[in-house]
From Swiss-Prot:
It comes from Mycobacterium tuberculosis (strain ATCC 25618 / H37Rv). Residues 265-323 are annotated as: Structural repeat A2/3. It comes from the Bacteria. Residues 324-341 are annotated as: Loop B. Ca(2+) has 50% activity. Changing residue 102 to A: Retains 40% ATPase activity (in residues 72-480). The chain crosses the membrane at residues 44-64. GO terms for molecular function: ATP binding; hydrolase activity. PANTHER family: ESX-2 SECRETION SYSTEM ATPASE ECCB2. Changing residue 150 to S: Retains only 20% decrease ATPase activity (in residues 72-480); probably due to loss of secondary structure. This is ESX-1 secretion system ATPase EccB1. Belongs to the EccB family. Gene3D superfamilies: Type VII secretion system EccB, repeat 1 domain, Type VII secretion system EccB, repeat 3 domain. The gene is eccB1. Residues 65-480 are periplasmic.
Length: 480
């Protein structure tokens, strides 16, 4: 009896009946107007193919680049202990931090995680690295360099006020409670027994006992200076003392053709469409002065004049005009109350492309940072400031002495500055394009060790103990 072969039509019909039976069981519908079940089988087939490809790729990766094995790099991390090791001349050396390892290798390599059994196959050397160096050197993003130094005085009304210094390296939060000084505002401060007045330009020495000067400036007799820190004193530019330059031969008759009662050193005025203009008589001419200078000159010596006499403009224009270098501003000042506005800040900012930095003096009720950033402050142990940073900084400082080149520093998020000797060292740490920063503020940060390759290649038995550590505050997690 011969074999009876099936035809394609029979096979197709059999498959159709099976599909129809599936629809009857799963969907309870045998009409088969559509066939959604076909997608299930296709997805299963596709999933199997993808799984096979993934397994094949994993097998190839494990063969050509096995995990936990030596080879391909000289920087390793023990998978069991997380100890960092660097391979030097066939010896495996423990290293204190990633920064030291990168300095040793000369490139910003990342460690490969290796099994302890693999590391034990290599001869072991002494620990190398720079004690006290940062573990790594991350840098916060941003094209604008902003550095701010703030003094906050507590108990300003008392006989022993306390000054707290803060270093801020992050964008500022400026609002009505803390904002830049206006041209008519000033702050009275003291440093080492001397009195200074701080304006938008900087600090000026002033003698509060000179009532002729202070009354013309609108400084009340009840105004009292409050102390500032050494860092703030050095950061604020010295704009010279606020005192009137002496006038030679003051009180002598003039030889300029003016009335006899206008002796040298006296003040007169002319009326213009913009208001009165004041002039002081000098030995060889006259000099225009602002209203505050005129008031100060008259309060010092009025030369018998009850009020500045008015002169005819046509007479004045025929007299030689000179310059009287008065440092006083154009209008009386409003003295900021430190008990109400205890924070005094000097801010330095330079953006990419700026030819020179911009500095601003601010005053207000609190530090110019957000409330959330207030909790980020780090009170340094060996420094005098509390530091607020939004990440690491790589900065370049230009020395005012032309004999010296610029200095580069890496500043970690804890506010410790580390010297970077040159651009090659910076490159090995993954640092580039340093931002400018003011030495007046950076100098207040705690100075860490220099990050150099020679220092990283030194071997150590143990780390020296910190001679003056600080106990963790009570109430902190894990503290007694």
């Amino acid at each position: 009896m011969g074999l009876r072969l099936t035809t394609k039509v029979q096979v197709s019909g059999w498959r159709f009946l099976l599909r129809r039976l599936e629809h009857a069981i799963v969907r309870r519908d045998t009409r088969m107007f559509d066939d959604p079940l076909q997608f299930y089988s296709r997805s299963i087939a596709l999933g199997i193919v993808v799984a096979v490809l993934i397994l094949a790729g994993a097998a190839l990766l494990a063969y050509f680049k096995p995990q936990g094995k030596l080879g391909g790099t000289s920087l390793f991390t023990d998978r069991a202990t997380n100890q960092l090791y660097v391979l030097l001349s066939g010896q495996l050396h423990p290293v204190y931090n990633l920064t030291s390892a990168r300095l040793v290798l000369g490139n910003p390599a990342n460690p490969a995680t290796v099994k302890s059994s693999e590391l034990s196959k290599l001869p072991m050397g002494q620990t190398v690295g720079i004690p006290g160096a940062p573990y790594a050197t991350p840098v916060s993003a941003g094209s604008t360099s902003i550095w701010t130094l703030c003094d906050t005085v507590a108990r300003a009304d008392s006989t022993s006020p306390v000054v707290q210094t803060a270093v801020i390296a992050m964008p500022l939060e400026i609002d009505a409670s803390i904002d830049p000084l206006q041209s008519h505002e000033a702050v009275l401060v003291s440093y080492q027994g001397e009195t200074w007045i701080v304006t938008t330009k900087g600090r000026h020495a002033i003698d509060l006992t000179d009532r002729a000067l202070t009354s013309s400036m609108g400084i009340p007799v009840t105004a009292r200076p409050t102390p500032i820190s050494e860092g703030m004193f050095n950061a604020l530019p010295d704009m010279g003392p606020w005192q009137l330059p002496p006038i030679p031969a003051a009180g002598a008759p003039n030889s300029l053709g003016l009335p006899d009662d206008l002796v040298i050193g006296s003040v007169f005025q002319i009326h213009t469409d913009k208001g009165p203009q004041y002039y002081v008589v000098l030995p060889d001419g006259i000099a225009q002065v602002n209203a505050t200078t005129a008031a100060a000159l008259r309060a010092t010596q009025a030369h018998g004049l009850v009020a500045p006499p008015a002169m005819v403009p046509s007479l004045v224009v025929r007299i030689a005009e000179r310059v009287y270098p008065s440092p006083l501003p154009d209008e009386p000042l409003k003295i900021v109350s430190r008990p109400q506005d205890p924070a005094l800040c000097w801010s330095w900012q330079r953006s990419a492309g700026d030819q020179s930095p911009q500095s601003t003096v601010l005053s207000g009720r609190h530090l110019p940072i957000s409330p959330s950033a207030m909790n980020m402050g780090i009170k340094q142990i060996h420094g005098t400031a509390t530091v607020y940073l939004d990440g690491g900084k790589f900065v370049a400082l230009q020395s005012p002495d032309p004999r010296y080149t610029e200095s580069m520093y890496y500043i970690d998020p804890q506010g410790v500055r580390y010297g970077v000797p040159n651009a090659e060292t910076a490159k090995s740490l993954g640092l580039s394009s340093p931002q400018n920063a003011p030495w007046e503020i950076v100098r207040l940060l705690v100075d860490g060790p220099v990050l150099s390759k020679d220092a990283a290649l030194l071997e150590h038995d143990t780390l020296p103990a910190d001679p003056s550590p600080r106990k963790v505050p009570a109430g902190a997690s894990g503290a007694p």
